[in-house]
Regions:
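ATP-binding N-terminal substructure of ATP-dependent carboxylate-amine bond-forming enzymes
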Residues: 1-107, 123-135, 314-321
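Active-site nucleotide/adenylate-binding loops and adjacent lid/helix of ATP-dependent enzymes
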Residues: 1-14, 42, 57-58, 98-192
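A short small-residue
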Residues: 7-13, 227-236, 292
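A glycine- and small-aliphatic-rich helix-loop capping segment at beta-alpha/alpha-beta transitions
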Residues: 79-88, 165-170, 299-300
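Short, flexible, mixed-charge acidic loops at enzyme active sites
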Residues: 75-82, 220-227, 283
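Phosphate-binding site of ATP-dependent enzymes
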Residues: 164-249, 270, 275-277
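ATP-dependent carboxylate activation and anion-phosphoryl transfer catalytic cores
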Residues: 2-8, 111, 240-321
Length: 321
């Protein structure tokens, strides 16, 4: 590749105004340092009014989005970057939107034949107009207890709760609606929780070793995710080879069904009989010190910084067409 076709600075974009701002900043700092360790020129930027001017002032920039939640994962950022004709790492706007919205991604996965929990998406207006009492009874019959209640459009398990009885459901719904106007109520799957990172390199989609998650709390919530010592991680997960392969295949299938690109992380629960159930895929997985994706990279024997650099190079090559 000659000089005129080489990319310029890598703009690691982190922060934003979502509920996950602090996690995003931590992810951004880690990716920035990893890329600098590879000798790459990095510019760190928040999502603010000066971003477009910054991108226009750089020669052939490549954006590495580390925004979590909101415009970073719902396709909004990708649409702007397409408008500016700027290369970026990660999924397209449409694919990011599909995976971020659990009311869309879950049904798509189920329609494609992937094992998923029984689930219902309920807009806040519907919950309010029809009345909590009637809906609570119907949800109990359809989904059963215990159940999981979470916002349709949020990450890091914000607004997510486990509901063991009907009396707890209204408060859980209110908690989920605090993060968006649609809540997803889904069957609680009892089993081993694992995360499987997926990367695309040289046209090949690869699943990295599964990370087993053992939180101190009842569910893998925000505190368990980002507080050191609150969760035990087993890497690679303590799964038999056939079950580990089934999890890897499921993660890759979800990546492809949702049309994701470059990298993703599938959240999976393995039932006691060894059957993996797909919960959701994240198109912009966290990269903090306690995040699952970097742990999987390390377990695979890969260099995290080199992988980040390869993802940038792939994004630039794709941009050139």
């Amino acid at each position: 590749m000659n000089d005129t076709l080489q990319h310029g600075p890598i703009v690691v974009l982190a922060g934003g105004l979502s509920h996950e701002r602090e996690v995003s900043l931590r992810s951004g700092r880690r990716v920035s340092q990893a890329l600098r360790d590879q000798g790459r020129e990095v510019v760190e930027s928040d999502l603010n009014a000066s971003l477009i001017e910054l991108l226009r002032g750089l020669n052939n920039p490549v954006v590495f989005p580390m925004l979590h939640g909101g415009v970073g994962e719902d396709g909004g950022l990708q649409q702007v970057l397409n408008l500016l004709d700027v290369a970026y790492v990660g999924s397209s706007a449409a694919a990011a939107r599909r995976s971020f919205n659990k009311a869309i991604g879950g049904p798509l996965a189920a329609q494609a034949g992937l094992a998923t929990p029984n689930a219902v998406a309920l807009p806040h207006d519907m919950f309010r107009e029809l009345g909590a009492a009637a809906l609570v009874a119907s949800l109990g019959e359809r989904i059963g207890f215990p159940m999981i209640v979470k916002p349709a459009r949020s990450g890091s398990a914000l607004g997510c709760s486990k509901v063991d009885a009907a009396a707890e459901l209204p408060a859980a719904m209110v908690g989920a609606y605090g993060y968006g106007d649609v809540a997803v109520v889904e069957e609680f799957i009892d089993g081993t929780e694992v995360a499987v990172a997926v990367v695309e390199l040289d046209g090949e989609v690869v699943a990295l070793p599964a990370v087993e998650i053992q939180p101190n709390s009842a569910i893998y919530d925000y505190t368990a995710r980002y507080t050191a010592g609150e969760t035990r991680f087993i890497v690679p997960a303590g799964l038999s080879d056939p079950v580990a392969k089934a999890c890897a295949d499921l993660a890759i299938s979800a990546h492809q069904v949702l049309g994701l690109r470059d990298l993703s992380r599938a959240d999976i629960i393995v039932r006691p009989d060894g059957t993996p159930v797909f919960i959701e895929s994240n198109s912009a997985p966290g990269m903090t010190e306690t995040s699952l994706f970097p742990q999987a990279v390390e377990a695979a024997g890969w260099d995290f910084g080199l992988l980040c650099a390869q993802l940038v190079d792939n994004a630039w090559a794709r941009h050139l067409g």
